[in-house]
From Swiss-Prot:
Membership in a protein family: Belongs to the methyltransferase superfamily. UbiG/COQ3 family.
One example GO MF annotation: 3-demethylubiquinol 3-O-methyltransferase activity
Encoding gene per record: ubiG
Organism, scientific name: Burkholderia lata (strain ATCC 17760 / DSM 23089 / LMG 22485 / NCIMB 9086 / R18194 / 383)
Pathway in which the depicted protein is active: Cofactor biosynthesis; ubiquinone biosynthesis
Lineage top rank: taxon: Bacteria
Annotated protein name in UniProt: Ubiquinone biosynthesis O-methyltransferase
NCBIfam families noted in UniProt: UbiG
Annotated InterPro entries: SAM-dependent_MTases_sf, UbiG_MeTrfase
Keyword tags: Methyltransferase, S-adenosyl-L-methionine, Transferase, Ubiquinone biosynthesis
């Protein structure tokens, strides 16, 4: 059985044509991307590395990693989003190899293949996030890096990420997130400990409404990032 929720896939497929519009529904991803890209590159030094972007959607992170010199493959189960990603890659001239395949399936096919594996803003949208973490651990080379980002599960995250972002500020379409699927850092750490990955750093992401920008912080109450390495 595929580790995906058909409703979640359809939700993002319906918006696929808007993926690269920086002022539409995916504006938060465009605004967030420089922060997460810089953080990933600071750890993994992307130039010349082979990278896999799991749950790549329309390719915002995939293209930006390729732009820094990585050889990037992006995977997703939304063929609509991948179609948009392919088209944008042609328009930008930045080469990314996209494929419609599940994380678990590519892990079985290509174990220990990638220097860098990213899984950003995806874990909270799948039924079994622990299985995705395990697939990431299988895919990365010994000594390689795996990066996750997701949403904490607490009252503050619900108020800001759901009520605030979706209903008040309308930064995201209503129904983008299911609070019950948010993941506490301790839970994600548990998934990681079940593999041969170890956590190197956990950082929060804070949104500054006055400047309308995201920044790294030590506040993991809402959005947070986790950098992991596989044992050599």
């Amino acid at each position: 059985m595929t580790n995906a929720d058909p409703h979640e896939l359809q939700k993002f497929s319906d918006l696929a044509h808007r993926w690269w519009d920086p002022n539409a529904e995916f504006k938060p991803l465009h605004d967030l991307n420089p922060v997460r890209l810089g953080w990933i590159d600071a750890h993994a030094h992307l130039a010349g590395k082979r990278a896999l972007d799991i749950g790549c959607g329309g390719g915002i992170l995939s293209e930006s990693m390729a732009g820094l010199g990585a050889q990037v493959k992006g995977i997703d189960l939304s063929t609509e989003a991948l179609g948009v990603a392919d088209l944008h890659s042609l328009e930008s001239g930045i080469t990314v190899d996209y494929e419609a395949i599940a994380a678990e399936a590519i892990a079985a096919r290509e174990p220990g293949t990638y220097d860098v594996v990213t899984c950003m803003e995806m874990l909270e949208h799948v039924p079994s996030p622990g299985d995705i973490v395990a697939a990431c651990a299988t895919l990365v080379k010994p000594g390689g890096w795996v990066f996750f980002s997701t949403l904490n599960r607490n009252l503050k995250a619900y108020l800001f990420a759901v009520i605030g972002a979706e209903y008040i500020a309308q930064m995201l379409p209503k129904g983008t997130h299911d609070y019950a699927r948010f993941i506490r850092p301790s839970e994600l750490a548990g998934f990681v400990r079940a593999t041969d990955l170890h956590i190197v750093e956990i950082k929060g992401i804070t949104y500054h409404p006055i400047g309308k920008r995201f920044a790294l912080s030590n506040d993991t109450d809402i959005n947070y990032l986790v950098a992991c390495r596989r044992g050599a």
